[in-house]
Amino acid sequence: LVDLFTKDSFNTVEDYSNLDWPETTWNFACSTTETSTWADGGRKFGELMEKATGGKVKVNIYAADQLTNGNQSEGIQALMNGDPVQISMHSNLIYSAFDPRFNVVSLPFVYDSYDDADAKFDGEAGEKLKEILGEYGLHCMGIAENGFREITNSKHEIKSVDDMKNLKVRVAGSNLLMECYKRWGADATNMNWSETY
Protein backbone atom coordinates (compact mmCIF):
# COMPACT_ATOMS: atom_id res chain seq x y z
CA LEU A 1 0.00 0.00 0.00
CA VAL A 2 2.98 2.34 0.19
CA ASP A 3 2.62 2.85 -3.57
CA LEU A 4 -0.98 3.89 -2.99
CA PHE A 5 -0.11 7.54 -2.58
CA THR A 6 2.72 8.04 -5.07
CA LYS A 7 2.67 10.40 -8.02
CA ASP A 8 2.26 7.54 -10.51
CA SER A 9 -0.88 6.20 -8.87
CA PHE A 10 -2.38 9.45 -7.61
CA ASN A 11 -5.71 8.99 -9.36
CA THR A 12 -5.77 5.23 -9.79
CA VAL A 13 -5.45 2.55 -7.18
CA GLU A 14 -5.26 -1.21 -7.22
CA ASP A 15 -8.00 -3.21 -5.59
CA TYR A 16 -6.80 -4.64 -2.26
CA SER A 17 -10.30 -5.45 -0.99
CA ASN A 18 -9.55 -9.19 -1.22
CA LEU A 19 -7.14 -8.89 1.73
CA ASP A 20 -9.97 -9.29 4.23
CA TRP A 21 -9.69 -5.82 5.74
CA PRO A 22 -11.49 -5.30 9.04
CA GLU A 23 -13.94 -2.42 8.95
CA THR A 24 -12.13 0.42 10.67
CA THR A 25 -11.63 4.15 10.70
CA TRP A 26 -8.22 5.79 10.81
CA ASN A 27 -7.61 9.34 11.97
CA PHE A 28 -5.29 11.50 9.88
CA ALA A 29 -3.83 14.54 11.64
CA CYS A 30 -1.83 17.44 10.30
CA SER A 31 -0.72 20.70 11.85
CA THR A 32 -1.86 22.92 8.99
CA THR A 33 -5.33 24.33 8.37
CA GLU A 34 -8.36 22.62 6.86
CA THR A 35 -7.76 24.34 3.51
CA SER A 36 -4.06 23.42 3.29
CA THR A 37 -2.47 21.09 0.78
CA TRP A 38 -1.60 18.82 3.71
CA ALA A 39 -5.27 18.37 4.63
CA ASP A 40 -6.07 17.98 0.91
CA GLY A 41 -3.45 15.23 0.76
CA GLY A 42 -5.07 13.52 3.73
CA ARG A 43 -8.45 13.66 2.04
CA LYS A 44 -6.99 12.19 -1.17
CA PHE A 45 -5.27 9.46 0.84
CA GLY A 46 -8.60 8.65 2.52
CA GLU A 47 -10.37 8.51 -0.82
CA LEU A 48 -7.77 6.14 -2.27
CA MET A 49 -7.64 4.01 0.88
CA GLU A 50 -11.41 3.59 0.93
CA LYS A 51 -11.38 2.65 -2.76
CA ALA A 52 -8.48 0.19 -2.34
CA THR A 53 -10.13 -1.61 0.58
CA GLY A 54 -13.60 -1.80 -0.88
CA GLY A 55 -14.85 0.77 1.62
CA LYS A 56 -13.68 -1.13 4.69
CA VAL A 57 -11.07 1.44 5.76
CA LYS A 58 -12.26 5.01 6.14
CA VAL A 59 -10.04 7.99 7.00
CA ASN A 60 -11.17 11.00 9.03
CA ILE A 61 -9.19 14.22 8.55
CA TYR A 62 -8.26 16.40 11.53
CA ALA A 63 -6.45 19.54 10.43
CA ALA A 64 -4.78 21.98 12.84
CA ASP A 65 -4.08 19.06 15.19
CA GLN A 66 -7.70 19.17 16.37
CA LEU A 67 -7.39 15.86 18.22
CA THR A 68 -4.67 17.31 20.46
CA ASN A 69 -6.10 20.83 20.86
CA GLY A 70 -3.66 22.31 18.35
CA ASN A 71 -0.58 20.96 20.11
CA GLN A 72 1.73 19.65 17.39
CA SER A 73 4.07 17.73 19.68
CA GLU A 74 1.10 15.98 21.27
CA GLY A 75 -0.11 15.21 17.74
CA ILE A 76 3.09 13.30 17.05
CA GLN A 77 2.93 11.61 20.46
CA ALA A 78 -0.64 10.51 19.65
CA LEU A 79 0.68 9.01 16.40
CA MET A 80 3.42 7.16 18.29
CA ASN A 81 0.78 5.84 20.69
CA GLY A 82 -1.50 4.89 17.79
CA ASP A 83 -4.42 6.59 19.49
CA PRO A 84 -6.23 8.76 18.59
CA VAL A 85 -4.00 9.33 15.52
CA GLN A 86 -3.05 6.55 13.11
CA ILE A 87 -1.69 8.64 10.19
CA SER A 88 -0.16 12.09 10.20
CA MET A 89 1.68 14.71 8.23
CA HIS A 90 3.93 16.81 10.45
CA SER A 91 6.99 18.93 9.94
CA ASN A 92 10.48 17.79 10.80
CA LEU A 93 10.59 20.81 13.12
CA ILE A 94 8.05 19.16 15.37
CA TYR A 95 9.81 15.80 15.20
CA SER A 96 13.01 17.57 16.29
CA ALA A 97 11.41 18.04 19.72
CA PHE A 98 11.57 14.23 20.05
CA ASP A 99 14.87 13.71 18.27
CA PRO A 100 17.36 16.50 17.43
CA ARG A 101 18.55 14.59 14.36
CA PHE A 102 15.48 15.94 12.55
CA ASN A 103 16.99 19.43 12.79
CA VAL A 104 19.30 18.58 9.89
CA VAL A 105 16.41 19.26 7.52
CA SER A 106 16.13 22.85 8.76
CA LEU A 107 19.78 23.85 8.82
CA PRO A 108 20.01 27.23 7.11
CA PHE A 109 21.74 27.56 3.73
CA VAL A 110 22.12 23.79 3.17
CA TYR A 111 20.08 23.53 -0.03
CA ASP A 112 20.84 25.34 -3.27
CA SER A 113 17.35 24.93 -4.71
CA TYR A 114 14.10 23.01 -4.39
CA ASP A 115 15.53 20.44 -6.80
CA ASP A 116 18.59 20.04 -4.55
CA ALA A 117 16.40 19.53 -1.46
CA ASP A 118 14.16 17.06 -3.29
CA ALA A 119 17.18 15.10 -4.56
CA LYS A 120 18.60 14.81 -1.05
CA PHE A 121 15.34 13.66 0.51
CA ASP A 122 14.51 11.31 -2.33
CA GLY A 123 17.91 9.73 -1.70
CA GLU A 124 20.17 8.80 1.20
CA ALA A 125 19.08 11.64 3.51
CA GLY A 126 15.44 10.65 3.17
CA GLU A 127 16.23 7.00 3.83
CA LYS A 128 18.09 8.00 7.01
CA LEU A 129 15.12 10.04 8.22
CA LYS A 130 12.83 7.07 7.56
CA GLU A 131 15.18 4.86 9.63
CA ILE A 132 15.00 7.33 12.52
CA LEU A 133 11.20 7.32 12.37
CA GLY A 134 11.36 3.52 12.42
CA GLU A 135 13.21 3.73 15.74
CA TYR A 136 10.01 5.28 17.13
CA GLY A 137 7.80 2.57 15.68
CA LEU A 138 6.62 4.78 12.82
CA HIS A 139 6.53 3.97 9.11
CA CYS A 140 7.21 6.84 6.72
CA MET A 141 5.22 6.65 3.50
CA GLY A 142 6.99 9.63 1.95
CA ILE A 143 8.81 12.89 2.51
CA ALA A 144 7.66 16.20 1.08
CA GLU A 145 9.10 19.66 1.35
CA ASN A 146 6.95 22.63 2.22
CA GLY A 147 9.26 25.35 0.94
CA PHE A 148 12.28 26.96 2.44
CA ARG A 149 12.07 29.07 5.58
CA GLU A 150 11.00 32.36 4.08
CA ILE A 151 10.80 35.26 6.48
CA THR A 152 7.59 37.23 6.25
CA ASN A 153 6.56 40.18 8.37
CA SER A 154 4.40 43.29 8.28
CA LYS A 155 7.13 45.79 9.25
CA HIS A 156 9.72 45.98 6.47
CA GLU A 157 11.55 44.18 3.69
CA ILE A 158 14.41 41.93 4.72
CA LYS A 159 17.46 42.15 2.49
CA SER A 160 20.22 41.42 5.00
CA VAL A 161 20.69 40.01 8.45
CA ASP A 162 20.77 43.60 9.78
CA ASP A 163 17.09 43.89 8.84
CA MET A 164 16.32 41.17 11.39
CA LYS A 165 17.42 43.29 14.37
CA ASN A 166 14.65 43.36 17.00
CA LEU A 167 12.07 42.09 14.49
CA LYS A 168 9.35 40.10 16.25
CA VAL A 169 8.88 36.79 14.44
CA ARG A 170 6.99 33.57 15.07
CA VAL A 171 9.25 30.52 14.95
CA ALA A 172 8.09 26.93 14.80
CA GLY A 173 8.92 24.70 17.77
CA SER A 174 12.57 24.08 17.06
CA ASN A 175 15.45 24.95 19.35
CA LEU A 176 17.69 25.14 16.28
CA LEU A 177 15.51 27.78 14.58
CA MET A 178 15.04 29.75 17.80
CA GLU A 179 18.82 29.92 18.18
CA CYS A 180 19.34 30.91 14.53
CA TYR A 181 16.82 33.75 14.67
CA LYS A 182 18.20 35.03 17.98
CA ARG A 183 21.73 35.06 16.55
CA TRP A 184 20.40 37.01 13.56
CA GLY A 185 19.08 39.60 16.05
CA ALA A 186 15.37 38.82 15.84
CA ASP A 187 12.99 38.73 18.77
CA ALA A 188 11.81 35.15 18.16
CA THR A 189 8.78 33.56 19.82
CA ASN A 190 7.86 29.88 19.66
CA MET A 191 4.28 29.41 18.47
CA ASN A 192 2.28 26.41 17.27
CA TRP A 193 1.30 26.62 13.61
CA SER A 194 -2.39 26.24 14.50
CA GLU A 195 -2.20 29.49 16.51
CA THR A 196 -1.02 31.60 13.59
CA TYR A 197 -4.17 31.59 11.46
Regions picked out by a protein language model, each given a short descriptive name:
Residues 10, 25-43, 64-69:
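Extracytoplasmic "Venus flytrap"
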Residues 25, 56-60, 168:
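Residues at or immediately flanking beta-strands
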Residues 2-16, 47, 73, 82, ...:
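Contiguous mixed-secondary-structure segments that line small-molecule binding/active-site clefts
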Residues 44, 52, 58-80:
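Extracytoplasmic small-molecule ligand-binding "clamshell" domains
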